[in-house]
UniProtKB/Swiss-Prot annotation:
Protein species of origin: Azotobacter vinelandii (strain DJ / ATCC BAA-1303)
Annotated protein name in UniProt: Urease accessory protein UreF
GO-annotated molecular function: nickel cation binding
Gene3D superfamilies: Urease accessory protein UreF
Top-rank taxon: Bacteria
Alphabetized UniProt keyword annotations: Chaperone, Cytoplasm, Nickel insertion
Localization, UniProt: Cytoplasm
Function field: Required for maturation of urease via the functional incorporation of the urease nickel metallocenter.
Main location: cytoplasm
Gene field: ureF
A GO term from the CC aspect: cytoplasm
Amino acid sequence: MNGMWALLRLASPQLPIGGYSYSQGLELAIERGLVCDPPTARRWLEDQLLLNLARFEAPLLLAQCRAAADGDWTALEALAERHRASRETRELHLESRQMGFSLRQLLEDLPELDEPSRAVFARLVEPGLAPAWALAARAWGIAPEDALAAWLWSWLENQLAVLMKSLPLGQQAAQRLTSALLPALGQAQRTACAHAPDDWGTVAFGLTLASMAHERQYSRLFRS
């Protein structure tokens, strides 16, 4: 498969894994007034990118992509378990599990998924989104660093979709916000690539509390 087409395919919002169903606490932040306009939305997303994703989620995903690309299945399975254990709330756990299951179903129906990858899927107790993303990158010949970029872009697009539905935020305003967030997106990728495993970690109290409160939110559009 052409590398560019494969990368666009992985990053596409049309990838049938249900990402549009989740806000990762953003809907609760909107409901509580923490995010109420483009400037507060920018601060929320920048903090998520630079203080949370770049320091733990992104380097952990990158490590899984590298393990899958190298065929280091022992490392991939250990990293997948670490990712599963790091889901701090019920909603975040269910989000990763559902999206991972959907991506697994998609991949297992495609000829590009090789036998070693199929065997890994069979061994994983609960394949979350991160290991499934890594195996998708392997199947489609996507370099680990590019797979990370696709994941970060997919995350940002989904968060912007939440804002457009819930804030609400117009399409033009969403594009201006995208332009404003591109430097943070690039910084998150660079930080993740430079982070050694001993440095992985984040304390995202706000995200965790928002996710917990969202479980009891009276009226909501999203599952997290």
